[in-house]
Design a protein with these regions (language model features):
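Acidic, glycine/proline-rich Ca2+-coordinating loop motifs
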Residues: 1-144
Length: 144
């Protein structure tokens, strides 16, 4: 279309293509480029004419297969973000699929550092090991 595009890569987003149209407005063209279902952990973008058709192709690099998280459409990695303990700090809690069960990414110790109430509600590792959704943290009083 003759307009320069800005291509963005990042965590938790699709590879995103933005363009400034002739009116000077920023337009999201991600869907037009067929990239609207590419949410991931993107950390690199390069442009190269791979198939020698005269058009630049978008190459994206993301977290590899050796990473702990194995996200698919059926078993996504999920991040819950809120100020769960109302201390004016954002508390991200990530769950991922581990052999068919959703589990918190952070260890009990790491979650206790972030949300100390967890230590009081999950005194034993065995009870914390049963946590497989954000709702399982409801006994802590800050999850709906």
């Amino acid at each position: 279309d003759g307009f320069v595009e800005l291509i963005l890569a990042g965590d938790w987003i699709p590879i995103t293509v933005l363009s400034i149209n002739k009116e000077g407005n920023l337009v999201n063209k991600t869907k037009e480029f067929g990239l609207d279902n590419t949410n991931g952990m993107w950390n690199a973008i390069a442009l190269h004419d791979i198939n020698n058709d005269g058009n630049l192709d978008i190459l994206g690099g993301n977290t590899g297969l050796n990473f702990k998280w194995k996200a698919t459409r059926g078993t996504p990695v999920t991040m819950y973000v809120d100020d769960f303990d109302k201390n004016h700090k954002i508390d991200p809690i990530i769950f991922y699929n581990f052999f068919g069960t959703n589990v918190p990414f952070a260890t009990k110790e790491k979650l206790v550092q972030q949300l100390p109430i967890i230590k009081k509600k999950f005194l034993k590792y065995a009870t914390f090991a049963a946590v497989n959704s954000i709702k399982d943290l409801a006994p802590c009083g800050f999850i709906m």
